[in-house]
Amino acid sequence: MCTDYEGPKPEQKAEIERKLRQEITGFVPRARIRPTDCAPIVVPEEDAYVCREMRWGWQVPWDKAPLVNAKSETLTTLPTFKPHLDQRCLILSRSFKEGGAQFHQPDWTVFCLAGLWRDEPSGSRFVMLTTTPNESVAPFHARMPFVLRTEQYADWLRGDFFKILTTPDKSPLEKFQPQPELF
């Protein structure tokens, strides 16, 4: 269960726009993001992509804690998610944590995680899709966020997402190794 990730830095806006192949409006960078925090989320709006500030976690009647993750394998069958399958979003990320380890792309480039969003009385909220882990994450946790390949972004937001659900990006990620303090 992913409950901690790092959003892009302000200077990475151009990188995000290059990967999305268009300008985005409304980008507000966030550093460390945890459940109930607000985060920049990319959604389609008319002929463009916009960044909207959304809170992480859906309120659900059976639990006081918000629902923050959704298993990609059961997404299309569970009544919690089925009504929102057309409300797909991109979660902007530089890294995520699983099992106490932090994972990132080479050179700390921005990548997108698959998500769903919905409007609630308290405002717009999102959940993060998860999948089986790749070889980098498997020693640390049984699940990981659903990482999208750059060429999947447009289809995830507006196209054939069923095929994407069966082909998560299993490319290896790098594990962040903090340097020990010398003094």
Protein language model regions, located:
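Short linear sequence motif anchored by a di-proline
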Residues: 1-183
